[in-house]
């Protein structure tokens, strides 16, 4: 029997169907965190302040279909935009696949379990606060290193 390569190893992001591309999202919620960028160095710092539409337990957007209309700065990833979205976490499957790297064992496509990202402690579940509970001028006080 010949082993068949999984789609994320056999295709580029551009070759994937929309459903395949969407399934790469592990549901970590890290892209929904407020980030700060050092203007001098370009370094990106994640905070534990999440978008008001992020479900803090499931780490999914509660308004996914309307997210861009509701949050102007919400980035909608496409196969062509991944490479330029430099702030994606190093564990992000979109980034890994674009770089030709394997997915982590805890990724739901590998584990077969949609909760494995949470079980492995790789999601923001239980680690974030909602943006409407903090003063956004104080985001520097919320910088975290666990991303």
From Swiss-Prot:
Superkingdom of the source species: Bacteria
InterPro entries reported for this sequence: Puta_zinc/iron-chelating_dom, UCP006173
UniProt signal peptide: none
Homology family: Belongs to the UPF0260 family.
Stated name of the protein: UPF0260 protein CJA_2436
Organism: Cellvibrio japonicus (strain Ueda107) (Pseudomonas fluorescens subsp. cellulosa)
